[in-house]
Amino acid sequence: MSKSSKAYRAAAVKVDRTNLYTPLQAAKLAKETSSTRQDATVEVAIRLGVDSRKADQMVRGTVNLPHGTGKTARVAVFAVGEKADVAVAAGADVVGSDDLIEKIQGGWLEFDAAVATPDQMAKVGRIARVLGPRGLMPNPKTGTVTPDVAKAVADIKGGKINFRVDKQANLHFVIGKASFDEKRLAENYGAALEEVLRLKPSSSKGRYLKKVTVSTTMGPGIPVDPSITRNFTEE
């Protein structure tokens, strides 16, 4: 048995699978069950009661986490002229147009998010098949197709996350690092969950939040009580 398997098993026995934890309890337990030596990412997985094959039940959104993600995102911006200068001043990691598109077509993908001014989208469409499957395609719905590139870059650098329901009706998003204290993790969880709840499709019937788990990278899933939709930092 590998050391990582042993560490996972040791962590997993600390989680009572029959219990539904509060967000604060889950955050604390996630820190305790992190089975890597590195500062693990803390993630949330939610099973929604929607039919994601239907356009009117697509759940997709963004939220600015109050305490950030613990990682400074690398941002690429598609812009020219004054907007390109503004993007550079705002802290974008790479800015360009045709040159940036050619670089990406050549296999370069060393960025975590992409922003584009509206006039660049016809060009960016040429690499949609590269960016789309990786969740990197700029989109007006997530605020990443905008003339206000400074705000878009600042939001992403400040801890803005995107989420989108997949074909199996699951959502996945990051709420921080294992080095965060549990209150900060719980507050980030609360901010994200409130946005997920706000986006509930009117056509969705039955229970909306079917299952919620919190975990660290390589750590066991910790079941969270899906009925807790406020007072996230209470035990």
Swiss-Prot record:
PROSITE patterns according to UniProt: RIBOSOMAL_L1
Coiled-coil annotated residue ranges, if any: none
Keyword Ion transport: no
Subunit organization: Part of the 50S ribosomal subunit.
Job description of the protein: Binds directly to 23S rRNA. The L1 stalk is quite mobile in the ribosome, and is involved in E site tRNA release. Protein L1 is also a translational repressor protein, it controls the translation of the L11 operon by binding to its mRNA.
Molecular function terms, GO-annotated: rRNA binding; structural constituent of ribosome; tRNA binding
Family annotation (HAMAP family): Ribosomal_uL1_B
Family membership: Belongs to the universal ribosomal protein uL1 family.
One GO-annotated biological process of the protein: regulation of translation
This protein's GO CC annotations: large ribosomal subunit
UniProt protein name: Large ribosomal subunit protein uL1
PANTHER family the UniProt entry points to: 54S RIBOSOMAL PROTEIN L1, MITOCHONDRIAL, LARGE RIBOSOMAL SUBUNIT PROTEIN UL1M
UniProt keyword terms in alphabetical order: Repressor, Ribonucleoprotein, Ribosomal protein, RNA-binding, rRNA-binding, Translation regulation, tRNA-binding
